[in-house]
Amino acid sequence: MDSLAALYKNHIVTLQERTRDVLTRFKLDALLIHSGELLNVFLDDHAYPFKVNPQFKAWVPVTQVPNCWLLVDGVNKPKLWFYLPVDYWHNVEPLPTTFWTEEVDVIALPKADGIGSQLPAARGNIAYIGPVPERALGLDIPADKINPKGVIDYLHYYRAYKTDYELSCMREAQKTAVNGHQAAHEAFLSGMSEFDINQAYLTATGHRDTDVPYGNIVALNEHASVLHYTKLDHRAPSEIRSFLLDAGAEYNGYAADLTRTWAANSDTDFAHLIKDVNDEQLALISTMKAGTSYVDYHIQFHQRIAKLLRKHQIVTDMSEEAMVENDLTGPFMPHGIGHPLGLQVHDVAGFMQDDTGTHLAAPSKYPYLRCTRVLEPRMVLTIEPGIYFIDSLLNPWREGQFSKHFNWQKIDALKPFGGIRIEDNVVVHENNIENMTRDQKLA
């Protein structure tokens, strides 16, 4: 297998090709990509945790250093000004010398405001890509060249197609996240609180809570019915019934995003429902192939949910087709089947149909689906179906013509378990689907 350095070299070739194309299309000379800046808390001298511009880390795996700049023109070697101040108050990252630095000119930038003297004098035809427009204006970059929509759309669209380097990084992120999931599962079995389970996860992954790509969802019992629950109770409940963990990891700026659900007692209706959701998730993945719309798989899973609602007698005396048609499956799975994954957890361009930014919205019936693209090789997506017992979504169904079809006694018995989500990260290849998560033996 090629080394990471060799993969990165080819990655840069691909990014250079895309850069040439976008510069030609919009008649630009170069892109100036800013890593970003620290942002202080209001009325304070402490900064929020730094989050790098994803368009910057697409080029170089520098994720923790603000005030860095990249100049790329698609022809010459990318030029990186790496912020290297003299500072005895804060840690200063050394000038990098690693697998990727042969492909980039790395130049020390001792002062954050010193970039102006380093750039070409003529900047009227350079596009700024970054989070601080006023910094670009201060560099005499025209306002219409600051994050121009056409350029951003183009860059975002092609980020869906991962290079071999990117896929390698994402597989490494999977390994780290799987280690965390295994440690968290053991902590759950030992009766730990959500807070302590999260600590076990972070220790196993070697991440801080500011390093993970999103806030870990560590949900015991009914907390699993809150889709993005991040509270982390310090005390374990008196009775632990279930555990939903949605937590990822990052490698060289690329994310993993995994979810598993466990029952404390393996011989309960809820435990059997977990197994069935898991089986249906794997069955759905087995049907996936390039050339099919992601929307089709979302709709297909609602049909699978209807089958499970019938099997477990959660909804009765109604055909599976009628359940889907009348959206009785909707309150049980209110989110989409998944989303694109990459430099960002909810990666960009999920709705773009071409590199000019043509937008195809999610179906009105399923407004929270995050991707409407046709699957193509090199795309990476999550597949994360769920079944939840959420009062605010189910209560409106307690009245009306369909109420009699809901087994409210069964639903009320399942509510204390919260809900189920099973999430894998998959790569679309020309003739197969690679399940990066299951390849790491995460059951």
UniProtKB/Swiss-Prot annotation:
Q: Which PROSITE patterns match?
A: PROLINE_PEPTIDASE (PS00491)
Record's GO cellular component terms = cytosol
EC annotation from Swiss-Prot or TrEMBL: 3.4.13.9
Highest taxon of the lineage:
Bacteria
Family classification: Belongs to the peptidase M24B family. Bacterial-type prolidase subfamily.
- The gene is pepQ
Q: GO molecular function terms here?
A: aminopeptidase activity; metal ion binding; metalloexopeptidase activity; phosphoric triester hydrolase activity; proline dipeptidase activity
Q: Which Pfam families match?
A: PepQ_N, Peptidase_M24
Q: Which residues bind Mn(2+) 1?
A: 257, 339, 384, 423
Query: Which species is this UniProt entry from?
Result: Enterobacter sp. (strain 638)
* UniProt keyword list: Dipeptidase, Hydrolase, Manganese, Metal-binding, Metalloprotease, Protease
Cofactor, how bound (note): Binds 2 manganese ions per subunit.
Question: What is the uppermost EC class here?
Answer: hydrolase
Q: Which reaction does this enzyme catalyse, per its entry?
A: Xaa-L-Pro dipeptide + H2O = an L-alpha-amino acid + L-proline
Q: Which GO terms describe its biological process?
A: proteolysis
List cofactor names only: Mn(2+)
| Protein task | Splits dipeptides with a prolyl residue in the C-terminal position.
Designated name of the protein: Xaa-Pro dipeptidase
Q: TM spans, by residue?
A: none
Identify the residues that bind Mn(2+) 2: 246, 257, 423
Q: Which InterPro entries does this UniProt record tie to the protein? A: Creatin/AminoP/Spt16_N (IPR029149), Creatinase/aminopeptidase-like (IPR036005), PepQ_N (IPR048819), Pept_M24 (IPR000994), Peptidase_M24B_aminopep-P_CS (IPR001131), X-Pro_dipept-like (IPR052433), X_Pro_dipept (IPR022846)
